[in-house]
Amino acid sequence: MYYIGIDLGTSAVKLLLMQGDGQIANIVSREYPIAFPHPGWSEQNPADWWDAVCAGIPELLNGFDASQVAGIGAGGQMHGLVVLDAQDKVIRPCILWNDGRTQKQVEYLNNVIGKENLSKYTANIAFAGFTAPKLLWMRDTEPENFTKISKIMLPKDYINYKLTGVHCTDYSDASGMLLLDVQHKCWSKEMLDICGVSEAKMPKLFESWEAVGTLTAEAAAKLGLPEGVKVCAGAGDNAAAAVGCGAVGNGKCNISLGTSGTVFITSSTFGVDKQNALHSFDHADGGYHLMGCILSAASCNKWWMEDILNTQDFGKEQEPITAEKLGANDVYYLPYLMGERSPHNDPAARGSFIGLRMDSTRADMTQAVLEGVAFAIKDCVEIARAQGVEIASSTLCGGGAKSPLWREIMANILGIPLALPQTEQGPGYGGAMLAAVACGEYATVQECADKLIKIKSVTEPDPALVKKYAARYELWHKLYPTLKPLYAEMEALQ
């Protein structure tokens, strides 16, 4: 049997066809636009996602027996607010995870409602990208649209709705809304009341591997699939990527270098970071996880290469960064191009190059970008370690993980071995794995991961470089608090 995995990303949907034994039979990608109607805003039209899926799946199945497809599972960009009216029509464009317009609402939630109360209700505090502040923004700024809301969902849930006609979500994705009681796996009445929405407007909750329904006749006809194909609830992209990299069960870590960057630490028991600098979410395997998220990771390198250096030859730009330059770069980079989430929770934060001199080179700045992202990931790792969480090794996924140089820099800055899974399709592969569990191909997510996940290579840290980078990190770590007062002034002048 075949299983379709959907990776609903920020810039494109990636679709993969997985055999029951885990082999990837085909991969297709379809891009769609992203709109920035105002500085700091970020939106997409949900219809563009669905159109991309409808165009991509027939292409994915070309040359394969569609009758052998048993299930579909999606991993999707988290936190985006999708709102439907009583006729299930989209009311307004989706406000995405990297949208920073909700600073006022975040301040209200954290300072008026209070971080302690938020943590009690949801195990988390408010961040600009979360869904609840977006609902408050709609209520404050677009009251006519807010009153039309009949259903609230997340990006991948809209795809599942179009596939099955069911309004649903899973616990891992719902955890990032600031509307879910993460510990008890139910909607928080307190948060729904604060946001002015009833539970009837919220999607039904499922475990990620549970089937939410089967394809409707209309969806099956559009996709060229039989109506009996099961659709599982799927997961938020980070949880799906963790499944696709084998980070399931207790005490595993997965680091993702995608558009954003994440540190994902699994646990069989519920726990909250004392400072709420890390997210405490449900995992797609039925357990829990702590997660740190930096808003700009591989997107920093893409911005630097394509927008500033006007090149797409990433490998050539990295060639001058030789071994002796590692741990010896005097140029530092703060990767806050979209503000920052973990650990600073500061939508006003800005990206910066610091330490430039007349003899600084293009390669120094390229190296600084790679190192700055790794230092920001280390910020999250160190917070987890301070809570007593042991992180002895990690898997690594995402577009940035394809760079051997970046893997080497990351391993030495973090001081741990980094394992690269055989498949590079983390969220999509995880989605297909969850679909395989939903269809009974595997009994549990753990069994599926144990049988399917293979490691391609491991990057080991060099003790001498670990020591050099530790000193550089201590200096880098002081830069944000030094510049923080200026970010608010920059915001005021905008």
Which positions does each model-derived feature cover?
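N-terminal glycine/serine-rich phosphate-binding loop of ATP-dependent small-molecule kinases
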Residues: 1-92, 120, 148, 220-221, ...
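Active-site core segments that coordinate phosphate-bearing ligands/cofactors
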Residues: 4-5, 103, 110-127, 133-168, ...
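Residue-level signal for inorganic ion chemistry
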Residues: 22, 45, 72, 99, ...
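Structural signal for short hydrophobic segments within the conserved structured cores
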Residues: 26-30, 203, 457
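Active-site donor-binding loop signature of nucleotide-sugar glycosyltransferases
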Residues: 30-32, 207, 283, 461
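Short beta-strand-loop/turn "lid" adjacent to the catalytic site in phosphate-handling enzymes
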Residues: 58-97, 125-131, 160-181, 204-207, ...
